[in-house]
Amino acid sequence: KVAPTNGVYFGPYLRYTNMDIERGIWLGSILLVTDAPQPPTIHIHQSIDLSPNPRQLKPVAIATHQRWTFYRYDIDLKMEESGPAKWTYAITSHLGCTRYEFLVAGRHETNWRFIATSGNDFALNVSANDRQKLGGVGYMWKDIMQKHAEIGGFHCQLGLGGQIFADRMWKEIPLLKQWLQMRGKEARKNAPWTAAHEEEVKHAYFHYYTSHFDQPYLREAWAQIPYISQVDDHDM
């Protein structure tokens, strides 16, 4: 069963998109994935503002999978002339409100603090027992979040390839296992790709990504450290 930890949505995933150097504008977005009839509302304000007049972000539906809808909330923030600033966004759904904070560099700041990660999943040959002994996927992200708090925040994280190892689908999806068992290259080459194949593979990807990024510490990191990501063969 695919279900988010908070019972309402997967995410948030806070993305750094770019910055408008001429105007001093930080550009990003927040992604939420939900099966609720209405998208959650998101308000954003500068953290230091003790009597905030938060701005509401507009949800845009960008994709669907079965009963789930992907909503993107675009962000544009004025970068401060005096230096870095922390911003808070609050997500409100029928189950309540959750707040997250992130760091935006000053307009003239050049010493951004980055982290880069890759290979953030376990290979197929690592047993569940060994994964547990190593602290699971979240062990590294716990360390990252501790460092994030100690230094006053990372400005951005670079998600390199191997955020998940989707190789597992060849062992877990019956239709793909059947294809691998076909004798002869020509037979495999000429095998039809059916609607059933499409749906099973799409749902596997959906499950792999949503469950992976919904794990403790990893979930918090991707909500509070703006990311830029790329993929490699493992992610696909």
Question: What are these model-derived regions, one by one?
Answer:
Residues 1-236:
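Extended recognition/assembly regions associated with phosphoester-bond processing machinery
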